């Protein structure tokens, strides 16, 4: 189904949340809901103390009752507390104060925002000026708040005839720490909002069904981004253009589908032309049946998520352009649909990649590496400073780590270390696996330069 045939407009993301800075006593703040932190074992933050004093010890009474203890992410709503201007006070557990790092700050903000939004408060104020996050300043905390607010406000309803009720919360304010500069906090709020919307863009693309989110749909979304942001240049390669470049590996995946493959290139030029870019490459298999090596029927509907690497690249490029970051970044999306059909690639077929290497396709369900290898070869023309590819690979990674950790392989330990640290803080953790030459012989083929699978020992 095409973009226009789907009945869906190009994405305009997503919430209409507004963010601001408010100062003053938390007991006097005009808001539908004021959020105050309580540390583990009921130790009150400065803001909670102020509210407790104004409300005739309302918070202390709840803690003494045993209903709330301040564990990380714990919440307790107080309606119409006496002596407080806000209609509601939300107690938010901060856990161990000395352990409040970026990761735990993200967790408590998620919990607080979900509880505040569930209360149907239209305006929410985070009274957090005394809160210190290890290794971070007050501006960082405000930015993370805006990011988590956008993510928490997301709901998928594009293909439902009856739309669920919209999130009531529309304005979020924060009291920054006393040492924070107002302009820094405002900039951080804006960047946090943009980051959250980038995450939601990726989630929305992933959630759309495969008959709507096709390679052509992804290309249309990228083109719309290019029209919206002057820093972006978007180029979409057709199958004929890819064939002229020798991308036989990528094209072998789409051979059985009526949906044309697309190579989508999004360039953000935020630095000097001479500055080498970083390159992001995303696997965009918009639906993966496995091809002739057909997957089992159970759970196949979830194979619409096989383009989430591409969705991540799209969301990241949108955020980079919105922030006007002073770097050069190239996003490359290899988009294809993997279907069985009379023209589909068969096990044992040999294809030639853009690099000139021949590949024996022993399993058509190992298609991600086939689309990515040509995209990675294409990326070489940019002489990049770094290349990061993002892909839903493989089932073995899920068997190894479950749903809690991403598998990561890298030939650059410094880059890997940076990505691992970012993953810990963003709650999107990864674990580095070995990338040793010892494994190369497992891909030997009797008939081609390389096989696309390494067998049960790989």
Regions found by a protein language model. Give the residues of each.
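Short amphipathic alpha-helical segment within the helicase RecA-like ATPase core
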Residues: 12-284
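A generic structural signal for tightly packed, nonpolar segments enriched in small/aliphatic residues
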Residues: 67-69, 218-458
